[in-house]
Amino acid sequence: MRGQGRKESLSDSRDLDGSYDQLTGHPPGPTKKALKQRFLKLLPCCGPQALPSVSETLAAPASLRPHRPRLLDPDSVDDEFELSTVCHRPEGLEQLQEQTKFTRKELQVLYRGFKNECPSGIVNEENFKQIYSQFFPQGDSSTYATFLFNAFDTNHDGSVSFEDFVAGLSVILRGTVDDRLNWAFNLYDLNKDGCITKEEMLDIMKSIYDMMGKYTYPALREEAPREHVESFFQKMDRNKDGVVTIEEFIESCQKDENIMRSMQLFDNVI
């Protein structure tokens, strides 16, 4: 029985990462370069070109308007994939299909990319920040990456597993408008107490401006982040009590055409 259980676990992992094709028996794996490009493109906030407006800050989970990444083709893979030894084995493919809105092929592509960047099967905060910094070589993305990491780390154990990763991506890329707004609210609610304060939003905005870098906006005024926060609260804090609740956040976003239009940027990313 013990040997059989181990065999099933290994089979699930091979099935998930696409290390063999059930029909041909051949490994379809992509090259490391292709995996890295795919993995990076799948994280939110891919290559923004401008500082966000209020509506963009509210609409995009990464607070910045991303460009549309190249569509992933799960079938365009090479024949030279070397399996990595993973310490954390993800849940079975069928279970992840039920829990997310990704297809079998998409999950396999995602897993190969995740395992290439994170051979242990999990990513800690420091590794996450290192990966994320590749988006913004001109600035300091470490603080914002910490906020984003905490949003993916839903059980607060200090690591993001593949299950955590695809659960977050499923909401961002395939979730309903309400799903995405709830995810964005959770990102901005830094202490997870159910409301966004001006201090929290100021920390978010400062991290975004730091991430963009002074070389992108050399003439940026020091008070710009605080002004952005005031604009945010003027739009969102409907009862003027100094905090934004999830109800205020969702209601305000749903009434803003620009925000709703921005939410569609994440459709069909993969």
UniProtKB/Swiss-Prot annotation:
Residues 81-137, 140-175, 176-211, 224-259 form the EF-hand domain. The keyword Zinc-finger does not apply. Ca(2+) 1 binds at residues 153, 155, 157, 159, 164. A lipid is attached at residues 45-46 (S-palmitoyl cysteine). Coiled coil: none annotated. Expressed in brain. Colocalizes with KCND2 in excitatory neurons including cortical and hippocampal CA1 pyramidal cells. Isoform 3 is expressed in heart and in umbilical vein endothelial cells. Not expressed in fetal heart. Residues 1-17 have a biased composition (Basic and acidic residues). This is A-type potassium channel modulatory protein KCNIP2. It comes from Homo sapiens (Human). The gene is KCNIP2.
